[in-house]
């Protein structure tokens, strides 16, 4: 499981994405789960990172899900029309 930090804004997004993409490649399971429960401060860059991780996971034949997506980020995803792409982990 990959974990997001408390803050994911444009300032951190590029470095975070590079770090997490490496971890996606190293994940051996069939499901890639991202834990977003620690996120407190974020902007739309957090969605961009999540969506890129989803693309990478799907390209590797993995299922993608998000655990603990903050309600405000879920609302933002809805506004952008991508909420259905961020499936909740069970």
Task: Identify the residue ranges that each predicted region occupies.
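STAS-like cytosolic regulatory interaction modules
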Residues: 1-45, 52-90
């Amino acid at each position: 499981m990959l974990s997001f930090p408390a803050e994911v804004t444009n300032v951190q997004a590029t470095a975070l994405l590079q770090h997490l993409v490496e971890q996606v490649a190293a994940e051996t399971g069939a499901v890639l789960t991202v834990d977003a429960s620690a996120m407190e401060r974020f902007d739309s860059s957090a969605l961009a990172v999540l969506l890129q991780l989803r693309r990478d996971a799907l390209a590797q034949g993995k299922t993608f899900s998000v655990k603990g997506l903050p309600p405000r980020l879920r609302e933002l995803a809805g506004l952008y029309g991508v909420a259905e792409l961020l499936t909740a982990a069970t």
